[in-house]
């Protein structure tokens, strides 16, 4: 990441809790209203960490923490983090995590003096598009689980069975394989026309 930032003239990238942070640092903080940010430059990295979560998160990384409490707010700790990384106000280009909360992004932008901004998809996102052999194997393994789950769902379909029962059959395949599906959508009859339908108790009709 730091090499990519250097090559593309990016002064810093700020990541919030979520997939980007997990990919770069293998850190998985709880995503809530308290600002938690991984900020990286071509030369270093550090984390703005709520004091409430610091002890737990210390088990996941040895990156420097700049902690803050609800009593003090994050601004002073963020300023210290920025100074420690040598980021100056008037920085030309900062990438922000396109998936993080807007108030987190605004906090960073304000602290850095309103620099030009872009999305971290241009750096971290590109890195995540490149898969190593282990990641490719994991994708194939998950695709195979998906296929088995679909077969189980089709096998469960018969008159009188509810959408939820069919979804449970598919979910059981994931659970048996040690996987956790994000969601299952089963829509009987006219419900099948709804692209984001919430699986319910409608029975399958002949």
Predicted features, each with a name:
Residues 74-179:
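Flexible, acidic/His-enriched mid-domain "rim/lid" segments that flank
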């Amino acid at each position: 990441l730091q090499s990519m930032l250097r090559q593309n003239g990016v002064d810093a990238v700020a990541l919030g809790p979520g997939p980007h942070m997990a990919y770069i640092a293998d850190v998985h903080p709880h995503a809530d209203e308290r600002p938690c940010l991984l900020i990286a430059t071509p030369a270093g990295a550090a984390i703005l960490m709520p004091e409430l979560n610091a002890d737990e998160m210390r088990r996941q990384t040895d990156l420097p923490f700049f902690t803050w409490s609800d009593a003090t707010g994050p601004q002073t700790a963020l300023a210290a983090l920025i100074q420690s990384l040598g980021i100056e106000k008037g920085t030309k280009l900062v990438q922000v995590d396109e998936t993080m909360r807007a108030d987190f992004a605004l906090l960073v932008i304000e602290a850095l003096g309103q620099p030009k901004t872009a999305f971290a998809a241009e750096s971290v996102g590109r890195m995540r598009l490149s898969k190593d052999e282990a990641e490719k194997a994991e994708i194939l393994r998950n695709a195979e689980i998906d296929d088995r789950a679909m077969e189980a769902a089709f096998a469960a379909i018969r008159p009188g069975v509810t959408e939820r029962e069919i979804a449970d059959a598919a979910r059981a395949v994931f659970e048996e394989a040690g996987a956790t599906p994000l969601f299952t959508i089963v829509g009987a009859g006219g419900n099948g026309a709804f692209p984001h339908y919430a699986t319910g108790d409608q029975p399958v009709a002949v």
